[in-house]
Swiss-Prot record:
<feature type="binding site">
    <location>
        <position position="29"/>
    </location>
    <ligand>
        <name>Zn(2+) 2</name>
    </ligand>
</feature>
<dbReference type="GO" id="GO:0008270">
    <property type="term" value="F:zinc ion binding"/>
</dbReference>
<dbReference type="InterPro" id="IPR018200">
    <property type="entry name" value="USP_CS"/>
</dbReference>
<dbReference type="GO" id="GO:0045066">
    <property type="term" value="P:regulatory T cell differentiation"/>
</dbReference>
<feature type="active site" description="Nucleophile">
    <location>
        <position position="281"/>
    </location>
</feature>
<dbReference type="GO" id="GO:0043161">
    <property type="term" value="P:proteasome-mediated ubiquitin-dependent protein catabolic process"/>
</dbReference>
<keyword id="KW-0498">Mitosis</keyword>
<feature type="region of interest" description="Disordered">
    <location>
        <begin position="336"/>
        <end position="358"/>
    </location>
</feature>
<keyword id="KW-0863">Zinc-finger</keyword>
<dbReference type="InterPro" id="IPR038765">
    <property type="entry name" value="Papain-like_cys_pep_sf"/>
</dbReference>
<dbReference type="GO" id="GO:0004843">
    <property type="term" value="F:cysteine-type deubiquitinase activity"/>
</dbReference>
<comment type="similarity">
    <text>Belongs to the peptidase C19 family. USP44 subfamily.</text>
</comment>
<dbReference type="GO" id="GO:0090266">
    <property type="term" value="P:regulation of mitotic cell cycle spindle assembly checkpoint"/>
</dbReference>
<keyword id="KW-0963">Cytoplasm</keyword>
<feature type="binding site">
    <location>
        <position position="44"/>
    </location>
    <ligand>
        <name>Zn(2+) 3</name>
    </ligand>
</feature>
<dbReference type="GO" id="GO:0140374">
    <property type="term" value="P:antiviral innate immune response"/>
</dbReference>
<feature type="binding site">
    <location>
        <position position="82"/>
    </location>
    <ligand>
        <name>Zn(2+) 1</name>
    </ligand>
</feature>
């Protein structure tokens, strides 16, 4: 990389103290939303992608003539007028100060000083929730609401346009006629019901009083229960109005009228974007995938650890700190017509009346976050429960996952800050923490936890343990005596190496095809161990235990085969390799994969005998994709199959769009998720009957037949 020691345009730079680059939530291109190669203009607040992505930063220079820009992640400075990277700073040392501030924001370490004592506006913050304060949260909550409202308005306008066009067509006119006839039928049913009620009331009034006062009192109390609306009988105007509708027709129309009153979801459940809070695309992609795995989502929609967590924590620690109630950490709906603006929001014991739980016709959506909770009160299971409730409520087009990010920072310190992270590492750490939390749940004051709750926790733990859990058969064969030694090893994902032809630098590597089946075959192929290094039990069996003779070492070969298939198969493609001592580069070749994967060729013989052929078939459920060329930079998106709408969705942080299977198969996959079509016990549903029967949709009253999606 060529650099200039001195650039005259840097000397003319005057950087504002409240530059937008200090907000991690703006570390993405304003045009294409990518977080790869992000350049911030140092003359204004514009942030865009570099010339090797979509050239939006270059276009901004051509339109505004602002020459100097800074790469947010690598912190290089580039001058477009000089067309070169620069090293010098201006007289006030703004670039050095800006780099120090960016490093502090990424690491969340604000113990930094400058020689002159001059600091930027945000330099004095010392809390690790730097950009999670109330002002920022409130601003983003309003933006989320406005985004959802704007999307909803656009959908309504588009629906009106298509409805007008549809009404002019022959099919539309026929539909209008049917609806008109249905209205008349409903009106006749209502009128007939009112007439019957009036007749019943008239008959009750003409009945003679009973001799027994007790029976007379009972009769009076019985008549009070029926309070019909008195409507004067009208003479039928035509024979058609005299027609009596049958009872079955009454029931059918009554059901139709009841169902028509149900609220349709604003968006298709699950089609909710997650705002990028500052290089958090790795977290957003993983959360989108986990929420679209049916068995995983249903478990955490059912389980909420917040209720007993506060009880056990307060009883165990006796801390003066009061754990925030569930309404302090979940998405709620507050009354929109509330006249007293200074009054506190109403408290609800559960999510049934909140954003995630039900349908409130006159409520305003609001996101409330925990305030500086201690780490022992934080529950990742509760945060997943809350977030999944919101994402699958059908009410939000965009959500800012503040609480989830805050919990990750506290419970997984390696991901604290706004630095770019690896999605595979985050997924492993997140699942490990969730499993540990569920395992330790029942041991903390079990007497205070209801039996039903402990049973539910045990069921969810069983699902979490088994959903990704499989077993490998490691078989070592001695080449001297042909003795085989078998070892069973657990696995939660399969890390697949690329073939040898992709491990070296070459110009024609990307043009050579590669498929995931080839990588699976490489994973399960027989591998020769180098030299005589294997201690064979059979070859050393004749040697006495305390004999002075040396141990016999032989040559051997090793093979890995799958002996127990997981319910959800995770395939991690090892795209990053070491190049030199401290550099990791990416293997950017496209890996072909299919919608249906047959795992039978990669299983051991015992599994082939014990399982039915249907158990080896897997369906593609999700794909995590990495955009970029390096390990420490890039952008993550995810392709997820939405079971509610029956379509594939491309999840790019806040932007979600419908896509086809062909588009999914063209993705540069990093992690593949396949769901077993039929489990070993022969069931197609992976969810336990106890959880499946008791689970509820987060928006029970929503009509999920609507297939509208974000455009």
């Amino acid at each position: 990389m060529l650099t200039m020691d001195k650039c005259k345009h840097i000397g003319q730079l005057r950087l504002a103290q409240d530059h937008s680059i200090l907000n991690p939530q703006k570390w993405h291109c304003v045009d294409c939303n990518t977080t790869e190669s992000i350049w911030a203009c140092l003359s204004c607040s514009h942030v865009a992608c570099g010339r090797y992505i979509e050239e939006h930063a270059l276009k901004h220079f051509q339109e505004s003539s602002h020459p100097v820009a800074l790469e947010v992640n690598e912190m290089y400075v580039f001058c477009y007028l000089c067309d070169d990277y620069v090293l010098n700073d201006n007289a006030t040392g703004d670039l050095k100060l800006l780099r120090s501030m960016l490093s502090a924001i990424k690491s969340q370490n604000y113990q930094c000083t400058t020689r002159s004592g001059r600091v930027l506006r945000s330099m004095g913050t010392s809390d690790d929730t730097y950009y999670l304060h109330d002002g920022t949260q409130s601003l983003l909550q309003n933006e989320d609401q406005m985004y959802t409202a704007l999307w909803h308005r656009r959908r309504i306008l588009m629906s009106k346009i298509f409805r007008t066009w549809f009404e002019q067509s022959p099919t539309g006119r026929k539909r209008q006629e049917e609806q008109f006839q249905e209205k008349i039928a409903k009106r006749e049913v209502k009128k007939r019901r009112q007439e019957l009620e009036y007749q019943v009331k008239a008959e009750l009034e003409t009945i003679h009083p009973r001799k027994s006062l007790r029976l007379q009192g009972l009769a009076q109390s019985t008549t009070v229960e029926i309070v019909p609306v008195q409507v004067p009988l009208q003479t039928p105007a035509s024979p058609a109005k005299d027609k009596v509708v049958s009872t079955s027709e009454d029931v059918r129309l009554k059901k139709a009228s009841d169902s028509s009153g149900k609220r349709r979801p604003i968006v298709t459940p699950g089609v909710t974007g997650l705002r990028n809070l500052g290089n958090t695309c790795y977290m957003n992609s993983v959360l989108q995938v986990l929420s679209h795995l049916l068995i995983f989502r249903q478990c955490f929609l059912k389980l909420d650890l917040n209720q007993w967590l506060a009880v056990t924590a307060s009883d165990k620690t006796r801390s003066p700190y009061k754990h925030p109630s569930i309404t302090d950490t979940v998405y709620q709906m507050n009354e929109c017509q509330e006249t007293d603006t200074g009054s506190a929001p109403s408290r609800h014991p559960s999510l049934s009346l909140g954003l995630s739980g039900g349908a409130s016709k006159s409520r305003k959506m609001e996101l409330i976050q925990p305030r500086e909770p201690s780490s022992q009160y934080i529950s990742l299971c509760h945060e997943l429960h809350t977030l999944f409730q919101v994402m699958w409520s059908g009410k939000w087009a965009l959500v800012s996952p503040f609480a989830m990010l805050h919990s990750v920072w506290r419970l997984i310190p390696a991901f604290r800050g706004y630095a770019q992270q690896d999605a595979q590492e985050f997924l492993c750490e997140l699942l490990d923490k969730i499993q540990h939390e569920l395992e330790t749940t029942g041991t903390r004051l079990p007497a205070l936890i209801p039996t039903s709750q402990r049973k539910l926790i045990k069921q969810v733990l069983n699902v979490v343990n088994n959903i990704f859990h499989g077993q490998l058969l490691s078989q070592v064969t001695c080449l001297a005596c042909d003795n085989k030694s078998n070892t069973i090893e657990p696995f939660w994902d399969l890390s697949l190496e690329f073939p040898e032809r992709y491990q070296c630098n070459g110009k024609d590597i990307a043009s050579q095809p590669c498929r995931v089946t080839e990588m699976l075959a490489k994973f399960t192929e027989t591998e020769a161990l180098e030299g005589k290094i294997y201690v064979c039990d059979h070859c050393n069996s004749k040697r006495r235990r305390f004999s002075s003779k040396s141990v016999v070492l032989t040559e051997a070969q090793k093979q890995l085969m799958i002996c127990h298939l997981p319910q959800v198969l995770r395939l991690h493609l090892k795209r990053f390799r070491w190049s030199g001592r401290n550099n990791r580069e990416k293997i950017g070749v496209h890996v072909g994969f299919e919608e249906i994967l047959n795992m039978e060729p990669y299983c051991c013989r015992e599994s082939l005998k014990s399982l039915r052929p249907e158990c080896f078939i897997y369906d593609l459920s999700a794909v995590v994709m990495h955009h970029g060329k390096g390990f420490g930079s890039g952008h993550y998106t995810a392709y997820c199959y939405n079971s509610e709408g029956g379509f594939w969705v491309h999840c790019n942080d806040s932007k979600l769009s419908m896509c086809t299977m062909d588009e999914v198969c063209k993705a540069q996959a990093y992690i593949l998720f396949y769901t077993q079509r039929v489990t070993e016990n022969g069931h197609s549903k992976l969810l336990p009957p106890e959880l499946l029967s008791g689970s509820q949709h987060p928006n029970e009253e929503a009509d999920t037949s609507s297939n509208e999606i974000l455009s």
